[in-house]
Structures are given as C-alpha cells and as structure tokens.
Regions:
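Gly/Pro- and small hydrophobic-enriched strand-loop and loop-to-helix capping segments
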Residues: 213-228
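Conserved alpha/beta-domain cores
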Residues: 1-203, 209-211, 225
Length: 228
C-alpha cells in the first residue's frame, strides 16, 4: 500500500479503472465515495487536497462536526445506519443517504425534506445476508418499501445499497453483489427507476464493480488503518 493518501487514492482510482475495463464498463460510471469515518479533520483535509471530492460518514453527529470545520470542501454521503431521530439533521447535511431501510424512516425523511424545501436523495439498504446484526430491509420487503417511497413527493430513491457478510475472499462475496443487481433489475422491470447500486468496500470493491456497482465505499484503502 502506498505511504501517502495521494498515492493510495491514485492506486484505488487505477484499480477502479481496471475493474471497469474487465467488465466492459466506462470507468466514469463508477463513483468513488471515500469513507472518512473515525478519521480526524486534518487527515480528511489531506484527502481533499489529494483530489477526494465525495466523503462518506457513518454517524450524523460526527459528520456534522467535520462539515462545520470543512465548509464547502466536499460532497457528503451518509453510508451508515440512520435513526429516525437523526433524520432532520441528515437531510440538512448529506447529498445522498445510502441507508433507508424502513417505510417509517422514508416517511420521516420526506417530512423533513418538505420542511427544508429539499428533495431528499437516497438509496434503499437491503440486508442480503439476513444478518440480525446489520440494518437493511429484507429482500422480500424491498418492493413494498419502494412502492411506499414512490408516493412521498420529497423523497427521491435512486437505487439500492448493500453491505454483504464479510467473507475471506472477494469471490465469496460476488454472489451477494450479483443478487443485489438481479433484485435491482427485477424492480426496474416492475417500473421503479433505480440507476444506482452502492456496493463494494476496500476488501471487495473490484468484484462489486465487475457486478455492476455504480458507487463504491472505500475507506482503509485510501485513508490507511483507522485510529484505534
């Protein structure tokens, strides 16, 4: 792994290009979300100077503190679980929320979007592994959630997101990425417009790109090991 953030970023960008090429895709169809959770502002500032433009955070309050210190420097995405009591602040802070996992949360975001006169862009998080420790709607419930969201005028669902089980080999994760894409394709056949697939992290993003990811969420490969 290169020693500097700039070197690591260039290396990740090259790996994204290579994975897209293997899949016969235009590299520009893949958006890099650099996940800065737990990273101090000084380190994030280095990443911005190196060319990072989109930052992903897991926690609303942590993001709020960082955004206050880095106003106007980046576009921010929420990639972690969102509680309904944090929804109002999330609407104000984030350009895209990756983790809508219930009708209740969708309705809450819609209400706060109306109050803020903002169309809230989001993705529906699907729990592909059926893991109780992870958030996300069940695969079987995804269409009902999308149908409910379609009736909410201040909510714009743009695709699906998933965090598959962590498995030793990226190839073992491939079937989960394939399933998310197949689910998206099925739902598009049912009339939902879902251009975005947020899937793939440091461990497995190349496989995710080969399977159709349009947003990859990469932290360690850019920022290095997280602080203890």
């Amino acid at each position: 792994m290169p020693e500097t953030i700039q070197g690591r970023l260039l290396h990740v960008q090259e790996r994204i290009r290579a994975a897209a090429a293997r899949a016969g895709r235009d590299p520009s169809s893949v958006t890099l979300v650099s996940v800065s959770k737990t990273m101090p502002v000084e380190v994030i500032r280095q990443a911005l100077e190196a060319g990072v433009t989109i930052l992903g955070e897991n926690r609303v309050q942590e993001a709020a503190d960082k955004i206050a210190e880095l106003p106007g420097r980046a576009v921010w995405h929420l990639v972690g679980h969102l509680q309904t009591n944090k929804a109002k602040q999330a609407v104000q802070l984030f350009a895209l929320i990756h983790s809508v996992d219930s009708i209740k949360l969708a309705q809450t975001l819609d209400r706060h979007g109306r109050e803020a006169r903002k169309r809230v862009r989001c993705l529906v998080e699907v729990n592909l592994g059926g893991e109780g420790s992870k958030s996300g709607t069940k695969e079987a419930d995804t269409q009902a959630l999308l149908a409910a969201a379609r009736d909410l005028p201040n909510l714009q669902v743009e695709g699906l997101m998933a965090i598959p089980p962590f498995l030793p080999s990226p190839e073992e994760v491939r079937p989960y990425f394939r399933r998310l894409r197949a689910l998206r394709d099925h739902l598009q056949g049912e009339g939902f417009r879902l251009p975005e697939l947020s899937m793939g992290m440091t461990h497995d993003f190349e496989v995710a790109i080969e399977e159709g990811a349009t947003l990859v969420r990469i932290g360690t490969a850019i920022f290095g090991p997280r602080p203890a």
